[in-house]
Amino acid sequence: MPELPEVETTRRGVEPHLEGRTLLGAVVRNPSLRWPVPPDLSERVAGEKVLAVRRRAKYLLLECESGTLLIHLGMSGSLRVMPAGAPPQKHDHLDLLLGEQVLRFRDPRRFGAVLWHLGPVEMHPLLQALGPEPLSDAFDGAALHQAIRRRGSPIKLAIMDNHVVVGVGNIYANESLFHAGISPARAACDLSRADCDRLAAEIKAVLRRAIDAGGSTLRDFVDSEGKPGYFQQTYMVYNRQEEPCRLCGTPIRQIRQGQRSTYYCPLCQP
């Protein structure tokens, strides 16, 4: 599933092709995504100038003169800038028309979304209750400590909660906890302020390194040019069960938390 680094990589890739351009309409081949594509999407976006391409959590926001397009990549989605005449493939569900180019939305599993919103986009129901951005100044050890101090859930599940901090999915939660030296099973409320300072710093560092590497490609993700990410080559724990820890040699363990796999080193993360 594309997480924050993959969505940010996509944003940076499509921004030069979209910002300042006028949308000519849309071609919707399959409206049955996680939420139905508006039936009049082409009419709504035709003539709209793209003022900015932003990201909020795992949502891409194409801010136009009259409204905002919200795009979520779901479990397997990607966006690519293609020549207008490029024939669509099986899972290419939607094109935004840019003249000689199109922005093509591909989503094999159809858990993504393309929605149109009028008014302040921060008030959209999908966005209005979100926590702070992990790479912003609003997220630090103090903010993390305040958000989790009454939570008895495991810390890994806490940092994956979008009310605590947005965009930290399973891959990057595992990696951040390893670098912070914190067991994923520790109760969130048991973390000290020093623990939270360390964890917040590592979340930022891991996400920045992942963005610099173009994100992670485990199955479907490619960037706007069709290229895979490379951060998976540097994983310390994720998907490395029974392999030796890169720091101490102890076999990496795998457990289940919240219906997801968790990976950790029992020696480095006591």
UniProtKB/Swiss-Prot annotation:
The active site is at P2 (schiff-base intermediate with dna), E3 (proton donor), K58 (proton donor), R260 (proton donor). DNA binds at H91, R109, R151. Binds 1 zinc ion per subunit. CDD domains: EcFpg-like_N. Its cofactor is Zn(2+). One of its GO terms (biological process) is base-excision repair. GO terms for molecular function: 8-oxo-7,8-dihydroguanine DNA N-glycosylase activity; class I DNA-(apurinic or apyrimidinic site) endonuclease activity; damaged DNA binding; zinc ion binding. It catalyses: Hydrolysis of DNA containing ring-opened 7-methylguanine residues, releasing 2,6-diamino-4-hydroxy-5-(N-methyl)formamidopyrimidine; 2'-deoxyribonucleotide-(2'-deoxyribose 5'-phosphate)-2'-deoxyribonucleotide-DNA = a 3'-end 2'-deoxyribonucleotide-(2,3-dehydro-2,3-deoxyribose 5'-phosphate)-DNA + a 5'-end 5'-phospho-2'-deoxyribonucleoside-DNA + H(+). Keywords: DNA damage, DNA repair, DNA-binding, Glycosidase, Hydrolase, Lyase, Metal-binding, Multifunctional enzyme, Zinc, Zinc-finger. Its EC number is 3.2.2.23, 4.2.99.18. The keyword Lyase applies. A zinc finger (FPG-type) spans 236-270. The keyword Lyase applies. InterPro entries: DNA_glyclase/AP_lyase_DNA-bd, DNA_glyclase_Znf_dom_DNA_BS, Formamido-pyr_DNA_Glyclase, FPG_cat, MutM-like_N-ter, Ribosomal_uS13-like_H2TH, Znf_DNA_glyclase/AP_lyase, Znf_FPG/IleRS. It comes from the Bacteria. Monomer. Involved in base excision repair of DNA damaged by oxidation or by mutagenic agents. Acts as a DNA glycosylase that recognizes and removes damaged bases. Has a preference for oxidized purines, such as 7,8-dihydro-8-oxoguanine (8-oxoG). Has AP (apurinic/apyrimidinic) lyase activity and introduces nicks in the DNA strand. Cleaves the DNA backbone by beta-delta elimination to generate a single-strand break at the site of the removed base with both 3'- and 5'-phosphates. Belongs to the FPG family. This is Formamidopyrimidine-DNA glycosylase. The gene is mutM.
